[in-house]
A protein has these predicted regions:
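H-loop/switch region of ABC-family ATPase nucleotide-binding domains
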Residues: 99-100
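Catalytic Walker B motif of ABC-type/P-loop ATPase nucleotide-binding domains
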Residues: 63-66
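C-terminal boundary and immediately downstream tail of ABC-type ATPase nucleotide-binding domains
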Residues: 130-155
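Helix N-cap at the start of a conserved alpha-helix in ABC-type nucleotide-binding domains
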Residues: 74-76
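A short, proline-enriched helix->beta-strand linker immediately N-terminal to the Walker B motif
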Residues: 57-61
């Protein structure tokens, strides 16, 4: 029902086609076996994948993800990042991700915009991040030891 909602609201397809599309989207996020479960019966990571399936149900040109990894363990966060990246590439969707997870930014970001106190402070590619001179950006992005190590290796 969750994935069917946008199809029921905004699609003129037959019920059979809407069900087929919903099942396709659930299968795409590896949740076809959970299609009969209620939200309270699935994990946080599965709930995030349902949200992605619902978001792609209408074949959008744009996908907006607000903190897609919040509340998830590192392994599940990586699964969500890979899923967002794969779907973005596979369906040629422009995806905007709002996140504080710098590992995610550096893992799936192509173009990065750093916003500080509501203003765009820096913009560039993830490769350009390694050479950025903006101190606030560097302090924020490279706060984790893992990313500090990656930066050193890219010098």
């Amino acid at each position: 029902e969750n994935v069917m909602f946008p199809l029921d609201m905004f699609s003129n397809d037959t019920l059979r086609d809407r069900i087929r599309r919903a099942r396709f989207c659930l299968d795409r996020v590896n949740l076809i076996d959970a299609q009969k479960k209620y939200p309270g019966e699935i994990s946080g990571g599965m709930q995030k994948r349902v949200a992605i399936a619902r978001a792609i149900a209408l074949n959008p040109q744009y996908l907006f993800c607000d903190e897609p990894n919040s509340g998830l363990d590192p392994k599940t966060s990586l699964v969500i990042d890979e899923l967002i990246h794969d779907i973005t590439t596979e369906y040629n969707i422009t995806t905007i991700v709002n996140t504080h997870d710098m590992n995610s930014v550096m893992g799936i970001g192509d173009s990065i915009i750093y916003i500080y106190q509501g203003h765009k402070e820096w913009e560039g590619t993830k490769d350009e991040v390694f050479n950025a001179t903006n101190q606030r950006l560097n302090d924020f992005i490279f706060a984790s030891d893992l990313l500090k190590k990656v930066k050193e290796e890219n010098k």
